[in-house]
Structures are given as structure tokens and as C-alpha cells.
């Protein structure tokens, strides 16, 4: 497993982690940042079947409570309506500025979650767990 820290300014610290089966390591790294213990995971139906439960289990074992937000599969859902539905769900869940959003999926999920994290409450912490090569670049 490789890690590279990217710091652009005092508020923006990014850590790039490369490796296989990085769920445990990613959750451990979340603990290093000053984030709330409540988080929301954005994923789609396909990815949720394979990877959501291990992530939820690891988060719970580290003291996090997590809610999942499942979005439809497909490029056609990368739009403001879907982003708006995610934002509405975050409000319903009581997510605040310290609560991280975790994107678990391909390009559509990572792009949508990144956009939502940047506009929700003037920005919230974001962790990307890409599951496709395109989402990684």
C-alpha cells in the first residue's frame, strides 16, 4: 500500500492511497482527521451489493455511525436532480459540516459525491473509494 499526502492550503489536505482492499486503511485514516463520527456513504445498487457491508462493518468497528445513500446506476443520473436528492437526504439525516461523505463507486458516484461535498453546508469532508479505473483519474 502506498500513500501520498497532497496539501494545497491549510483547509485542504488530500491523501492519495493506492492499493488493494483498502477499506480498513481508509477508515483508519479518517480517524486522523478532525471529522465527526457520523458519516454518509453514497454508492449505487451494483457496488452496494459487493462492497457496502464490509465498509459499514469497518466504520462501525471504529466507532462511526453511517447511513447509506443509494443512487441509481448510470451516467444519465449524473445530474443536478440526483445531487439535489443526495443533499435532501443529508439534511434528513442531520449531517453537519464535520461529518464526512464517503463515495463508494465509479465515476458517476465519485463525481456526484464530490460535487455535493463541495456545496453542502459550504463544504464537508470527503473520502473517495473509487471502484473503477476512470473514477481513479
Task: Indicate residue ranges for each PLM-predicted region.
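Glycine/threonine-rich beta-strand-loop-alpha-helix active-site module
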Residues: 78-137
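ATP/NTP phosphate-donor binding region
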Residues: 1-99
